[in-house]
Structures are given as C-alpha cells and as structure tokens.
UniProtKB/Swiss-Prot annotation:
One of its GO terms (biological process) is secondary metabolite biosynthetic process. Its EC number is 1.14.19.-. Disulfide bonds: none annotated. Melleolide sesquiterpene aryl esters are cytotoxic secondary products with anti-cancer potential. Armillaridin shows therapeutic and radiosensitizing effects on human esophageal cancer cells. Armillaridin induces autophagy-associated cell death in human chronic myelogenous leukemia as well as of hepatocellular carcinoma cells. Armillaridin can also inhibit the differentiation and activation of human macrophages and thus might have potential to be developed as a biological response modifier for inflammatory diseases. FAD binds at residues 16, 19, 49, 149, 331. The keyword Acyltransferase does not apply. One of its GO terms (molecular function) is flavin-dependent halogenase activity. It holds the Pfam family Trp_halogenase. This is Flavin-dependent halogenase armH3. The lineage of its organism: Eukaryota, Fungi, Dikarya, Basidiomycota, Agaricomycotina. Flavin-dependent halogenase involved in the biosynthesis of melleolides, a range of antifungal and phytotoxic polyketide derivatives composed of an orsellinic acid (OA) moiety esterified to various sesquiterpene alcohols. The halogenase catalyzes the transfer of a single chlorine atom to the melleolide backbone, resulting in a 6'-chloromelleolide product. The enzyme acts on free substrate and does not depend on carrier-protein-dependent acceptor molecules.
Length: 504
C-alpha cells in the first residue's frame, strides 16, 4: 500500500473489489497511470464465495489464473440444485470438458486481497483506508467528472484530479446513486439474505468428481432458497435467501412466540427453522456440524442502472447492477464490467472510436450480461415459488437435467466468456427462458403469482418500441465472447498492449 495519494493521475478507480482491481490491473498492463482508492484496509470480509468457470479466462488475461490454482482454494467442479423434494437434484458440471474448467469456492477476504495485490504488482498505485467524499465535475461539461475529494481516518484529506474515472464502489454506487440517480430496483427480487459459518459439516458427493460442489435448495414452503458452500479454511458457508415480506412475516411470528428472546436470538431461530425447510442441506450438514461465530444478514435487492457510462467515466460491478446470487454470478459480472470498462477507456484514449461510441458499448455490454442472468434467475424463482408446477421440467421428468443443460451457457457464464459457445446454443437458452417466463393458462393458476420484473429492465439501442419492451431482444444477436461479441458495431480487441475496440 502506498502512502500519499497523488495530486493527479490518468485513470482513477474507486473500489478495490473484483471489478475495481480487475479494471485497474488491465489498464495498468496497457501502460496507463492508474490510481485505485479503497475505503477499507484489505483483507476485509465480504460475502459472495462461489465463482463460475467463466472467470478463468478473465483471470488468465492478467496472468492471475496460476495464482488461483496454486493458492489452495477448493476447486468448484459444478453446482447441485434441488428445486423440488420429489425430484432428484440437478447438476451443472463445470468439468465436463476437462478439470481445468472448474471454478473455485473462495474466502472472499483472501481472494479480493490476492487480486488487489496482483493489480499493485502490475503497476496500479493502491491506496487503502481512503474514503471518497465528493466528486467534482467539469465546469465546461457538467456530466464529466474531473477530480474528487478524499479523506482518511487519521484526519488527512485532499483532492486528486484525473482524466478517466472507473466507479467500482460496490453497492454504494457513488456515481449511480449520488450523482446520476439512475438506480432501479427489481420489484420481484427484493430479498433478504441471512447466513453464517459452520464447522464439521459434510460434503456433497464425497469421493466423487462432484465433491466440494456447492448445494442450492428451494425451501419446502416456497418462500426462498438456501445455500451450502464448502470453503478451504474448514468452514462451510450456509445461508438462506427469502423474499423480504416473507422474512418480515416469519420474524414477526417467531417474535410473538419467543417468550422475551432478544432480536438476535429470534433471528437465529428463524434461520434454523428455515434450514429445516431444506432437508437436503440438513443432511449435508450432518449431526457433527457446529454453528460458529455470529449470524449475518443483508438486504439482497436486485437492481440495475439506466446507463453504466458517460463522458470519461465507467461504472462496473455492484456499483451499477446486482442480481440475486442464486447462480453465483457476482464475481463474473464484476470481471465482465471491469474488462469492458478498461477496454472502452483504452479504445477512447487510442482513438479506436468516439467516446460516445465507447460509452454505448460499455452500457450495452453490462446490461446484456446482467439481463442474461436476470431472466434465468426469474425462471428459477418461478419454480421455487410454485414447486408442484412444471415450470422447469416436463410432467413425466423426475429431474431438472434438461432445464439445467438448456441454461448452461448462462449459469456457467459461457455466454460472456466462452469462445467455443455457438450462437445456436445461446439462442436455445434464450428461447428456453422465453418459454418459462411467457404467460400461459397454467401459469395463471399458480398459487403464488410471480412478477417477472421485465418492465424493470430497459432494453436500449432497440430498433422499435416493440423490441424495446422485450429485454431479451438485445441478446438475440450476441456472438460468443469478449473477443468476438459484436455490440453496436464494435468488438473488443483482446491483445495486451493494443486493448481497445475494433469496428466490425
């Protein structure tokens, strides 16, 4: 960590999480002067411990993959999904094409610190314990940020000017919430997460190639789902995600029956009661498992922004959008946004395109990646909230294998990172999502109606009003990955020293 924040830099990155560290690392490798400000001092705790295999090519691009392989994190060979107690769990196999396609279950404090230190090794000037107080904009161009005021816990403060800004400030989303005011929450995914850590837990499929895969299970009362993620430090992350109104209802019920228990005790009772509604998870915990530490909770609201870029700034990661964690998409979307931010800034600096074209590319790229996961998650929630209805399976099927295979390009992150994914495979996934979310007579009879939230997602750059009403429209013509996916007539040139955009 460097001592004194400089007075100026080429590129200023706010936030040292995966989106910020990655964008900074990519830009530093391109020879730009990059300063990164992080309000915490790493390592620091963070939830979001499961990765997708699509992260590997991103990490490989900055020579970070080998560090991950050698660090000791548990390899994640796939993920098991139990959506109905009467049917066998589904499984998405990351290693079907070889063991090197596995992802990892990570302790985020360690992973984030490792990535931030790697960025510093690549030339990023990292300053921790620095809080951004205010962003200043150009007097000649009111939407262009040109400097910011910062402060530290010891009372020191100052200003730093820059030519380009990457806002990767996490859910605080400084640009989006404080200045642009363009954040919108998805009404159907206003959830609450409660979690803690256990020791002595079992493993899913021990002794097989599926061992250490996380387990995700729908609660039997159709109010949410639970996760079970084994970690290399001997702990297992176990959490529950509930709709906000259901969480409030359950807490009120437990409080009424609590006989004077404290609020934390009531919350723990709710947590344990919900775990009992995931019998497969309880079986994995086993009789020797012990809850350690304290219970944690957080609002788990899904949100997005109307734009993720503007004159000389980009927004990446949770600073711009967040989607329900059912498919562990957080780090994937952070790296996607980080690389897009870096690529479009480099493109604008190098004259590959206009700044307006670079901004449009970045906003479309982030929106497309977010919307892919949004529609798959909405389909999963439709099944969770109506488990006896054939949403993701046919009546005669005893499993969800067909559905999971259909959704593979999205839930493994391939749609954004796999150069071998064919357009036909992606189109098949999109068609499946449409069939799940389309209204029909059977869905009208569901006990718990589900608002898809489609109206919350704005489809930009659409040729007609009809297309704009269909958030999937923007995904139909996508190619395969960063290096070949054409957006608004451009694709990314993935070559170190020449990173930027190329006109298709």
């Amino acid at each position: 960590m460097e001592a004194q924040v400089p007075l100026s830099t080429d590129i200023l990155v706010i936030g040292g999480g995966p989106a910020g560290s990655y964008a900074a690392a990519v830009l530093a490798r391109e020879g730009f002067k990059v300063v990164l400000l992080e309000k915490d001092v790493f390592p620091r705790y963070h939830i979001g411990e499961s990765m997708l295999p699509s992260c590997r090519p991103f990490l490989r691009f900055i020579d970070f993959e080998e560090k991950m392989k050698n660090y000791g994190f548990f390899p994640k060979p796939g993920a098991a999904l139990k959506l109905n107690q009467d049917k066998r769990e589904g499984y998405t196999d990351f290693t079907a094409n070889g063991p090197d396609n596995a992802a990892w279950n990570v302790v985020r404090s360690e992973f984030d610190d490792l990535l931030l230190r790697h960025a510093a090794e690549l030339g990023v000037h990292v300053y921790e314990g620095v809080q951004v107080e205010k962003i200043h904009f150009s007097p000649d161009e009111s939407t262009r940020p040109v400097s910011l005021a910062w402060s530290k816990g010891d009372g020191t403060q100052g200003d730093v000017s820059f030519n380009w800004l990457v806002d990767a400030s996490g859910r605080n989303g400084i640009m989006s919430t404080r200045y642009l005011k363009n954040r919108t929450f998805n009404k159907s995914l206003k959830n609450v997460a409660v979690w803690g850590y256990w020791t002595g837990a079992g493993r899913y499929a021990p002794g097989t190639k599926r061992e250490n895969a996380p387990w995700f299970e729908a609660l039997t009362d159709e109010t949410g789902w639970a996760w079970f993620i084994p970690l290399h430090n001997g702990a297992t992350s176990v959490g529950v995600v509930l709709a906000e109104d259901e969480s409030k209802r359950k807490k009120a019920q437990h409080r009424a029956e609590s006989n004077g228990k404290s609020l934390s005790e009531v919350q723990h009772d709710c947590y344990m009661a919900d775990l009992q509604r995931a019998p497969g998870l309880i079986q994995l915990l086993g009789s020797e498992a012990k809850f350690e530490g304290k219970l944690m909770s957080a609002g788990d609201y899904s949100y997005h922004a109307s734009e993720y870029a503007g004159s000389h700034f980009r927004i990446a990661g949770d600073a711009g959008a967040f989607i329900d964690p059912f498919f562990s998409s957080g780090i994937h979307l952070a790296l996607t946004g980080g690389l897009s931010a870096a690529s479009t800034i480099a493109a604008s600096i190098r004259g590959n395109c206009t700044e307006e074209e670079a901004c449009a590319f970045h906003s479309s790229k982030v929106e497309t990646a977010y919307t892919r996961f949004l529609f798959v998650v909405l389909g999963i929630y439709k099944q969770i909230r109506a488990q006896e209805t054939a949403v993701l399976y046919e009546a005669e099927e005893d499993n969800f294998d067909r559905a999971i295979d259909s959704l593979r390009p999205v839930i493994q992150g391939c749609a954004d990172a796999d150069e071998n994914l064919t357009e036909a495979e992606l189109q098949s996934t999109l068609d499946f999502c449409r069939s799940v979310l389309a209204p029909n007579q059977q869905q009208n009879n569901l006990r718990t109606p589900v608002d898809t939230g489609a109206a919350d997602v704005k489809a930009k750059h659409a040729p007609s009003e009809t297309d704009a009403q269909n958030p999937l429209q923007s995904m139909d013509d996508c190619k395969r990955n960063f290096g070949t996916e054409v957006i608004n007539g451009f694709y990314v040139k993935m070559e170190q020293g020449m990173l930027g955009l190329v006109c298709a």
